[in-house]
Amino acid sequence: MIIDGLPGGGAEKVVLTLARGLMERGHRVSLFSLRTVCDYPIPDGLHYLVIKDRCQKPWRKLTELSRRAQLLNQAIVAAEEEGGSFDLVVSHLHKTDRIVRRCTALSPSKTWFCLHGVFSASYLAQRSGFSLWLKKAKTRKVYQNRNVLGVSQYVIDDLKQAFHIQPAREVVIFNPFDFEAVLAQSFKPCKMAGQDYLIHVGRFHETKRHDRLLRAYARSGLTAPLVLIGQGSDEITTKLKALTCELAISDRVVFKGFTSNPYPWIRHARMLVVSSDSEGFGNVLVEALICHTPVVSTRCPGGPTSILTGDLARGLAEMNDDSLAATMKDIWDNPPDVTRLNLQPYSVEKICQQYIDLIDKNKNPSDMYHQKTSL
């Protein structure tokens, strides 16, 4: 596994859950981190290596990708000399992918680029003209004719259509969840246990649309507190706090900050809300359902519509303040039964096996070439 650091985000948590699950099934796992940042505990037994870029030259940004690729090359070669060749390599997050694409020590047939988000929303939405053309060209250079793994079908389709990319092979594998671990952590103490409140869990980033959430909450008529678990830049945090004052809800909005264990807060909440413009998968939706907490989400590009099906689809709102407010009020007053759901498609056991299956497919890739496979 290769990733650009381990800050407190969903993709980072997925990587550690996957690594732990694979090790528990007898596999040797190495995790190469391209930054020192780490907000999560590292699983026991994981070969964890931080590859530091110590360059301080004025032109370091111009040579960053090739320089860091060379450092990664050296680390890969050293690890394989010590423990044998890797059977499978998975690169996570776009900046990591740009570096991994330049690594000559990695076999293209064994290397998969894992897409965690909707690229057009993240990288094209604010661009036009030459900037738009250049970003598309750079992205095509990374993924064209390479193995692509998507956490939802939407993220793969978006990459292919928005950037005109044809992967060598493509596969959909959902994010893994350790149900027992999530439930065990959810029974840790929670300061608001026994109170009615709704919750949002996610970093303070423009795509998460906390502004939409706050306006919808103000319009919903709900008086129970809204707890925000997450962190972001000082600028965004200041703007959000100012918006709560403008909407006259500052006394009901709790800025909890980041916590490595949000599950007690999720379990005791009466409802969890996602207000994003896009979600590659929607980890927190599954985590809430594991904790038997009803959920509301915008009907945004990505994974939420594939997670919230059947009666859960009542929790899907259009991507505007009024629809989100009305849906929040409806689910608050008439929650669906979330105690008897089949969440096995997201189990760590099932997902780990699908990753292991990629090793066999690497040995016989011809039958997958330019074909779409959903696992």
Question: What are the functions of these language-model segments?
Answer:
Residues G129-V148:
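Membrane-proximal helix-turn-helix segments that form the acceptor-binding/catalytic region
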Residues P294-T298:
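Short hydrophobic beta-strand element within catalytic cores of glycosyltransferases
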Residues V50, G310-D322, K329-P335:
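Conserved acidic donor-binding segment of nucleotide-sugar-dependent glycosyltransferases
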Residues F258, D277:
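Aromatic "clamp/platform" in nucleotide-sugar-dependent glycosyltransferases that forms part
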Residues Q144-E170, F179:
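A short, active-site helix/loop in glycosyltransferases that binds the activated sugar's phosphate group
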Residues E12-T17, D196, H200-R219, T238-K239:
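A conserved mid-protein helix/loop that constitutes part of the nucleotide-sugar donor-binding site
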Residues I2-G8, K13-V15, G21-E64, R169, ...:
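N-terminal strand-loop element at the rim of the active site
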Residues S91-D97, L115:
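Short His-centered aromatic/hydrophobic patch
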